[in-house]
């Protein structure tokens, strides 16, 4: 599956904690690229409170990505690489980063990325 196909497959999906949120969106792409789901042992969560607890137990998104992916300069990020903007896991795509928000997919300028990981 290409990144474009992956993003397109999420266009009509509604936000749902533990099923279609920023973490599952990024983790799903990482699994496609690496063959490993780094969230498997940490599922399920169904509420914002449960998600926050799971992330705290993991050490946070930065820790999860640092432990499992190669950190890179965000200026060197390619399509499909991972970033975190305002606490939201996102994927680089062209001039933007894309993530799942409460109202569907959200896009931000890629220059907002302060960190990145190669996927």
What are these regions (language model features)?
Residues 14-34:
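Active-site nucleophilic cysteine motif
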